[in-house]
């Protein structure tokens, strides 16, 4: 019987740190559902003490996720641990993950404590977390640069205090595979109570070694791997969990381990995270890149025709990637759309068929054929759309020449429809001037991206913007066959978020004065 490797996903915590603007609670819950369906064992939903938004996200995910264990991060500080426990208490089963720095440079220059003091802080943190749950994970931050004698002392103390998972992070991505595997092996050889805990690893990719280091640790006895979908994370990112899962599946004969991952969900989960986080996947990325299963060499193509196994060690279908793009037209009925969604692997709870079909008909009237990737894009945006948006674009007309552009719009502002026209340096600039005038908001754009969703001239355009308003960053997205319209939707997405935030602030202020 093969050993089980626990998959611990931190896309919603460590991964989110790479984003210019935080995900909304709704977006995080959508990703959490996808991770649950993927078969992830533990979902680290956030760092509750860091902000009210993170607390709400963890609490919401803890309430709705049933088949994966929900985890929250905390420093080795009593208040952090108490807040983490409060956010998780609605969960059927949860984990508290507490950590403290252990490397010499961190202990001396960041914590400015003696190593004995740091060990006592770790013991106190683990014991406090155990008051709330038996499932406590303790991390030795910067373990990769921690002297092995100190690391062994810390691990032994944390296990004695009640930690059932000990995480060994390569926090700055410094170690080499043989070195990191050796650290894990020494822990098994030198820590007397090591059999009372699962050893976990959390590797960063600063030197491009995160996956290799994680696999070296598994070979040395680690039985939990932490990482993110698509390797998302600050700096160079984290260990890519889809790569870990497929390495273990493809080389299980050599490794002798397995995971609970449902591999056919990998492609869909990867695509969702990329879309919602606005983080494109490089074409040559292992497993989920657009070129991962392409063969352009004539010799390779000849071999593939004769026997796919000549150059293909895993199939596109094994990660849920369909070999053919499906297409529909405006004459296709609801049943056909549902059948295509079924073929793509989506279930009824993933989308609202009425909403999706209405959006599909509008798109089909515009572009003729609608492909599977179009349906997926429509589904993602429909799931994120708020029915109570105060500002909605009802009409858009653009006249553009070689010098200036003129844009006219009709904007629904609550119960009132307002009209505006403006001249600008291009149609998007003119459109944004109209929106600013009608809404009364003028915001600073930190980032503006346009990407194609689909193939050819009929592909959908996605606009993504990062905006700054009163010191807070907002992320907006828009999707349309017309990039000017998509740009307008993205700005209105941001402005509606700002409007809701202002409304909430006013309510809180009124309550505070009562």
UniProtKB/Swiss-Prot annotation:
Database matches in Gene3D superfamilies: 1.10.238.260, 3.30.160.270, Aldolase class I
Binding site for Mn(2+): 14, 202, 204, 238
Region listing for Regulatory domain, in residue ranges: 392-514
GO MF: 2-isopropylmalate synthase activity; acetyl-CoA C-acetyltransferase activity; manganese ion binding
Subunit structure: Homodimer.
Database matches in InterPro entries: 2-IPM_HCS-like, 2-isopropylmalate_synth_dimer, AIPM/Hcit_synth_CS, Aldolase_TIM, LeuA/HCS_post-cat, LeuA_allosteric_dom_sf, LeuA_bact_synth, PYR_CT
Role noted for this protein: Catalyzes the condensation of the acetyl group of acetyl-CoA with 3-methyl-2-oxobutanoate (2-ketoisovalerate) to form 3-carboxy-3-hydroxy-4-methylpentanoate (2-isopropylmalate).
Gene it is expressed from: leuA
Keyword tRNA processing in annotation: no
Name the UniProt record assigns to this protein: 2-isopropylmalate synthase
């Amino acid at each position: 019987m093969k050993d089980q490797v626990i998959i611990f996903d931190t896309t919603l915590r460590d991964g989110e740190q790479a984003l210019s603007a935080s995900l909304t609670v709704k977006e995080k819950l959508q990703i959490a559902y996808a991770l649950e369906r993927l078969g992830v064992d533990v979902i680290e939903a956030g760092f509750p003490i860091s902000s009210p938004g993170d607390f709400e996200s963890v609490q919401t995910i803890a309430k709705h996720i049933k088949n994966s264990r929900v985890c929250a991060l905390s420093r080795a500080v009593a208040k952090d641990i108490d807040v983490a426990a409060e956010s998780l208490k609605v969960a059927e089963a949860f984990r508290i993950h507490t950590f403290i720095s252990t490397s010499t440079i961190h202990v001396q220059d960041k914590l400015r404590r003696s190593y004995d003091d740091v060990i006592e802080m770790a013991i106190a943190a683990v014991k406090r977390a155990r008051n709330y749950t038996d499932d406590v994970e303790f991390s030795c931050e910067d373990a990769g640069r921690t002297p092995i004698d100190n690391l062994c002392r810390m691990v032994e103390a944390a296990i004695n205090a009640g930690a059932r998972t000990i995480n060994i992070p390569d926090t700055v991505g410094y170690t080499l595979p043989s070195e990191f595997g050796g650290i894990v092996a020494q822990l098994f050889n030198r820590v007397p109570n090591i059999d009372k805990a699962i050893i976990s690893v959390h590797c960063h990719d600063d030197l491009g070694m995160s996956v290799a280091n994680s696999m070296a640790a598994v070979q040395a006895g680690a039985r939990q791997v932490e990482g993110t979908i698509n390797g998302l994370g600050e700096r160079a990112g984290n260990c890519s969990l889809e790569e870990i899962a497929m390495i273990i599946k493809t080389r299980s004969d050599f490794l002798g381990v397995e995971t609970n991952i449902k591999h056919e969900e990998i492609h869909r989960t990867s695509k969702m995270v990329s879309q919602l986080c606005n983080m494109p996947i490089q074409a040559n990325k292992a497993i989920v890149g657009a070129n991962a299963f392409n063969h352009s060499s004539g010799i390779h193509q000849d071999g593939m025709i004769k026997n796919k196994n000549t150059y293909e060690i895993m199939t596109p279908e094994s990660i849920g990637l369909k070999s053919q793009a499906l297409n529909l037209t405006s004459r296709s009925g609801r049943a056909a759309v549902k059948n295509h969604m079924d073929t793509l692997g989506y279930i009824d709870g993933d989308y609202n068929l009425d909403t999706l079909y209405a959006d599909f008909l509008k798109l089909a009237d515009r572009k003729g054929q609608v492909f599977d990737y179009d349906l997926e894009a429509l589904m993602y945006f429909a799931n994120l759309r708020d029915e109570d948006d105060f500002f909605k674009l009802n009409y858009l007309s653009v006249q553009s020449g070689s010098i200036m552009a003129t844009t006219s719009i009709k904007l629904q502002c609550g119960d009132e429809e307002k009209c505006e026209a403006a001249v600008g340096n291009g149609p998007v600039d003119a459109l944004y001037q109209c929106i600013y005038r009608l809404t009364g908001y003028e915001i600073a754009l930190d980032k503006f991206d346009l990407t194609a969703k689909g193939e050819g001239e009929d592909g959908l355009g996605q606009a993504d913007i990062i905006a700054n308003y009163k010191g807070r960053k907002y992320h907006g997205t828009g999707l349309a066959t017309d990039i000017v319209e998509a740009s307008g939707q993205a700005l209105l997405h941001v402005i509606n978020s700002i409007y809701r935030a202002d409304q909430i602030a006013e309510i809180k202020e009124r309550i505070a004065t009562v």
